[in-house]
């Protein structure tokens, strides 16, 4: 695990302890049960069936490596722009300390559109999964580099019991082998090297032959141009999670359409 990931995980554990005091788990479960669900995996498959790229478009204000990506940051506006220009789903950062995200951003983005929404955060505890459902998320992220295989399996089982889709994210072959023990069809390959923070779509391409056909490969990070998209689609990768390229554009949805459609 990288130093930054170690730091983030430590902060997450503290956040969970504090959150459990202010909003007990049973209270959250009650709130979660009243939320509607949107079909995250179904939305991706619908794009594939139409012969289109399935884009999980990210609502992200900042990152630890790049700082603030977008000064004019209005999640509802961004979500509507993404939906209008063909996104399949949204990904919304809820991590406050490292990515300047917020639960409120997820709630605002989801309320502004009809797209399913992934809670993008560092999940280390079952509490965060119930919390995700309570805030209106339709899917959660599990990061293989941050979790033991048995932890991932337990967290996935809880997520699925609540109706949430699970995107499991890997950075290398060892993590991929762990991820493939899960039931989720969604295998995210993060093209960012956790030690150097450099990105290369070769990371995704190099792992494709090890992934069964019944899984949906989601390529993440470092997709910055139409050339990247065309290269990956030629390799039969049709699902993309993109944030930075859209966030730096004047009109995020227009940039999405320019890159993908």
UniProtKB/Swiss-Prot annotation:
UniProt EC number: 4.1.1.48
NCBIfam families referenced in this protein's UniProt entry, alphabetically: PRK00278.1-6 (NF001373), PRK00278.2-4 (NF001377)
GO biological process: L-tryptophan biosynthetic process
Reaction(s) catalysed by this chain's protein: 1-(2-carboxyphenylamino)-1-deoxy-D-ribulose 5-phosphate + H(+) = (1S,2R)-1-C-(indol-3-yl)glycerol 3-phosphate + CO2 + H2O
Similarity field: Belongs to the TrpC family.
Keywords (A to Z) from UniProt: Amino-acid biosynthesis, Aromatic amino acid biosynthesis, Decarboxylase, Lyase, Tryptophan biosynthesis
PROSITE patterns membership: IGPS (PS00614)
SUPFAM superfamilies (UniProt xref): Ribulose-phoshate binding barrel
Catalytic EC class: lyase
HAMAP family, alphabetized: IGPS_B
Name of protein: Indole-3-glycerol phosphate synthase
Record-linked Pfam families: IGPS
Keyword Amino-acid biosynthesis: yes
Organism: Paraburkholderia xenovorans (strain LB400)
Encoding gene per record: trpC
Annotated metabolic or biological route of this protein: Amino-acid biosynthesis; L-tryptophan biosynthesis; L-tryptophan from chorismate: step 4/5
Record's keyword annotation contains Lyase: yes
GO molecular function: indole-3-glycerol-phosphate synthase activity; phosphoribosylanthranilate isomerase activity
